[in-house]
């Protein structure tokens, strides 16, 4: 009898169910006796023994279903060693649940914070396999994360829709795209959506350069401008501040997000009406796109093979079009950021896209 636990942690995305399905279908097809324990609401389920035994029926018809059938929650890594309000040792509780159920392995689906806790559990002696989930595409060691392509599609659609109204009213429009620390989603959606200006966390912007780019378009007879702005975009002035100083500034800011500050500064300089559109959590929602369905089926199948090989302590990555087992110890806690000198940035700039630098 092979007993495997599974949980989804952190922010949801479109392809979590597809990834779990890939794991279970491959295991069910190749392992004679199998029990799947689904922990509810992420690490909380593992800590407080909230789980249910899943059957193949639970994974039928979920390939196209967004969200997660197990539920999810955020359990910050920095608090994992801190006892809960009742004094419970969370790490010890997770180990106890794992051993009490007699699990052979635990498949954890999540992003960077989830991955760090997965590695902690590996260090504590649990058999762990991590599947890289995030719309941000910022997990080190894999070329792509599941959820990223689906989110690109939604963010691109948002920019596409703004184009028509911006053109009709000769407006400057900012579309705010998810991504506090990295700009992968904004970069890809911005290029795909034909944004004229793209602002990323990795490339601090000069507001004067942004204004010049808009002014240049106006002089060329182009009455509207589209900006794709990441949630974590930062000006050169703010980038020069210490982390503590920047946090203080944000706490005192009158703006709900950086996009509104950018809009205000453009409006002040050019006297133009600037509108902001925020697709927000729609970027996490809906059905996974075909690419993510294929990716998750492959990653899930590869995770099942690692389980059958009893090769744990790894993340199942996609590298050069091939699935690969990457040691968790080598990647946990590392962030994959956009390289400002990358070929893609250079190619985008060659087409006239302004990055504010």
Please provide the spans of the model-predicted regions:
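Short glycine-rich or small-residue beta-strand-to-loop segments that form or flank ligand, phosphate
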Residues: 3-11, 69-71, 104-109, 173-176
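Accessory alpha-helical/coil subdomains and C-terminal extensions
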Residues: 97, 108-110, 116-120, 148-167, ...
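Short, acidic/small-residue loops that bind anionic groups at enzyme active sites
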Residues: 121-145, 199-206
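Phosphate-binding loop/pocket of nucleotide- and phosphate-handling active sites
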Residues: 261, 316-357
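N-terminal phosphate-binding or glycine-rich loops at protein starts, especially the Walker A/P-loop
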Residues: 1-50
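Glycine-rich oxoanion-binding loops at beta->alpha junctions
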Residues: 48-106, 146-153, 157, 357
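Short glycine/serine/threonine-rich phosphate/pyrophosphate-binding segments
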Residues: 12-23, 46-47, 91-92, 103-119, ...
């Amino acid at each position: 009898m092979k007993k495997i636990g599974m949980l989804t942690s952190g922010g949801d995305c479109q392809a979590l169910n597809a990834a779990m399905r890939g794991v279970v279908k491959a295991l069910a097809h190749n392992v004679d006796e199998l029990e799947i324990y689904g922990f509810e609401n992420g690490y909380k389920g593992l800590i407080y023994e909230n789980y249910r035994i899943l059957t193949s029926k639970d994974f039928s018809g979920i390939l196209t279903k967004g969200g997660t059938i197990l539920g999810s929650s955020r359990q910050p890594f920095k608090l994992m060693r801190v006892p809960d309000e009742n004094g419970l040792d969370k790490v010890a509780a997770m180990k106890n649940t794992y051993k009490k159920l007699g699990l052979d392995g635990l498949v954890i689906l999540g992003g960077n914070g989830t991955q760090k806790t997965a590695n902690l559990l590996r260090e504590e002696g649990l058999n762990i396999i991590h599947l890289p989930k995030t719309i941000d595409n910022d997990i080190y060691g894999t070329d792509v994360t599941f959820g990223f392509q689906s989110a690109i599609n939604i963010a691109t659609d948002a920019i596409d829709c703004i184009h028509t109204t911006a053109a009709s009213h000769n407006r400057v429009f900012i579309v705010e795209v998810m991504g506090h620390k990295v700009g992968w989603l904004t970069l890809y959606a911005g290029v795909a959506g034909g944004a004229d200006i793209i602002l990323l966390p990795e490339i601090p912007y000069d507001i004067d350069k942004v204004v010049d780019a808009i002014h240049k378009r106006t002089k060329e007879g182009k009455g509207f401008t589209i900006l794709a702005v990441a949630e974590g975009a930062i000006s050169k002035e703010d980038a020069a501040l210490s982390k503590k100083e920047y946090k203080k500034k944000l706490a005192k800011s009158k703006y709900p997000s950086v996009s509104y500050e950018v809009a205000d500064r453009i409006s002040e300089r050019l006297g133009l009406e600037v509108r902001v559109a925020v697709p927000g959590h729609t970027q996490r929602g809906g059905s996974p796109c075909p690419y993510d369905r294929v990716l998750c089926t492959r990653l899930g199948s590869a995770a099942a093979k690692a389980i059958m090989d009893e090769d744990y302590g790894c993340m199942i990555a996609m590298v050069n079009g091939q699935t690969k087992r990457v040691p968790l110890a080598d990647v946990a806690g590392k962030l994959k950021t956009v390289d400002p000198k990358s070929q893609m940035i250079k190619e985008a700039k060659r087409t006239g896209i302004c990055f504010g630098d």
